[in-house]
Amino acid sequence: MTKNYIFITGGVVSSLGKGIAAASLGAILKARNLNITIIKLDPYINVDPGTISPIQHGEVFVTEDGAETDLDLGHYERFIHTKMTFLNNFTTGGVYSQVLKKERRGDYLGATIQVIPHITNAIKERIILCSKNSNIILVEIGGTVGDIESLPFLEAIRQMAVDIGRKNVIYIHLTLVPYIATAGEIKTKPTQHSVKQLLSIGIQPDILICRSEKTVPLHERKKIALFCNVPVDAVISLKDVNSIYKIPKLLKNQKLDDYICNYFKLNVPEADLQEWEEVIYAEKNFNNTIVIGIIGKYIKLPDAYKSVMEALKHAGFKNKIKVDIQLINSQEVENKNFQILKNLNGILIPGGFGDRGIVGKLLSIQYARENHIPYFGICLGMQIAIIEFAQNVVGIKEANSTEFDPQCKYPIIDLIKNRPNNSSKNYNKIENRINLGGTMRLGSQPCKLSANSLSRKLYNQEIIIERHRHRYEVNNLLFKKIEAAGLQVTGRSQKNNVVEIIELSNHPWFLACQFHPEFTSTPRDGHPLFIDFIKSAGKHKKNFI
């Protein structure tokens, strides 16, 4: 099977949307019956993003096999119907770590280890390993051309054209074409300079995708083509749109997929983008608008909750409801500032770490429970819901998590006992930690649902498999008293009897789960828990108008 590689780089500035562009192109090529995978190369020194602050990096997307990866892999999964693995994302730190381990073992037989060839060879090996079962491999290189961090990756993809043949490689460069409002002009000079930087590395781009506030007109595309040495048909205008789900059609309308298929000499059927037409239609046509509050601590960067926000939108599509998402800093609720919660039709508390903002989250849950507002807790959102119920309903004021208070008298939430490095009650002290990275309960785990529960009804099956990312769990030894007071456990893991789902029966909609359902939601199908949460929030709005 011939393998064709499409390398996507970015220029001028960061955050241009290379991930969305790669996912959208992948969706079009997948619709042409091509076997696609997408790889993200990240040029930072961290081994993976698992220990990076969400405020700096955005969410950590967890794959089925438990890899902690870049949020772009979430876009890849949602757009191309393909599950990602640990092979689909690697970093400079991961590559260097691998090479250094080999050097310590003596695998290099005394050679002097250098960026070229050892680091670049390791990068190429990882790309080839991930492409084993695909015939079209899209590779997104993080960062911006010109950054020193990206150089080993750029050199590796330059070499790949030599190794496998230039005819099997396409270089796509995504650049910014700014619109200067005061002059009423689009400026192409930044793109020209960015391409020159790429040429200095030895890479001639085959296709330019020009991100701009407005459509780049033909005469400007001709100018870019002339000075950047690419055909006019290969200069693609990517104007700003109000929905990422419009991008596949935008690229298809400019025949980007035709250009690629002709380049690779692929005889494949035309792409049918009907499913994307349906998504766009659902996004525009709704009967109701509701307000959902995400109560979190990382709201300075909305990308910290990217998959949660997308899953809420997907659920809105399925219910013909427009979801207005409000990101609320949990610390703003700490002084019982319930005014900011009054207009919400649903409250969601997502995953997180640490004790900052916990009081505000507890108060938000209490407000949702007492005022019969639909509540959805995810990961930490489930753990805090249990603590709130234990303190305010059962009357166990000492109930807490050892994450927030290692010496608490009633540790209803405690470290997972059978995980590596989790033996110390003083785990939060730096000196007692061995490794933070890669030591949580990660990836897909089976869960058994209770008969006659809401979750069983929504999933319509007894055994489900969902993705996890947590270091703390419910303490089963202390939970019986809480369960007896009315907080039902309706889902437990099959392996270790871990509490996975809780429900409150005397409430319109109060459900929380230890796993992360947002990672498996798609714009076409949504996710059953999110869909019913939004449905309940819609009912709440009607009841309180």
UniProtKB/Swiss-Prot annotation:
User: Per UniProt, what is one Pfam family of this protein?
Assistant: CTP_synth_N
Q: An example of a Gene Ontology BP annotation on this entry?
A: pyrimidine nucleobase biosynthetic process
Domain (Glutamine amidotransferase type-1) spans 291-543
Keyword match Zinc-finger: no
Q: Looking at the record's lineage, which domain of life comes first? A: Bacteria
Show the SUPFAM superfamilies listed in the entry: Class I glutamine amidotransferase-like, P-loop containing nucleoside triphosphate hydrolases
Q: Which residues bind ATP?
A: S15, L16, G17, K18, G19, I20, D72, K239, D240, V241
Q: Which residues bind UTP?
A: S14, K187, T188, K189, P190, T191, Q192, K223
Q: What does this protein do?
A: Catalyzes the ATP-dependent amination of UTP to CTP with either L-glutamine or ammonia as the source of nitrogen. Regulates intracellular CTP levels through interactions with the four ribonucleotide triphosphates.
Q: What else is known?
A: CTPSs have evolved a hybrid strategy for distinguishing between UTP and CTP. The overlapping regions of the product feedback inhibitory and substrate sites recognize a common feature in both compounds, the triphosphate moiety. To differentiate isosteric substrate and product pyrimidine rings, an additional pocket far from the expected kinase/ligase catalytic site, specifically recognizes the cytosine and ribose portions of the product inhibitor.
Instruction: Identify the NCBIfam families for this entry.
Output: PRK05380.1, PyrG
Q: Hey, which family's this protein in?
A: Belongs to the CTP synthase family.
Protein name listed in UniProt: CTP synthase
- Annotated source species: Buchnera aphidicola subsp. Acyrthosiphon pisum (strain Tuc7)
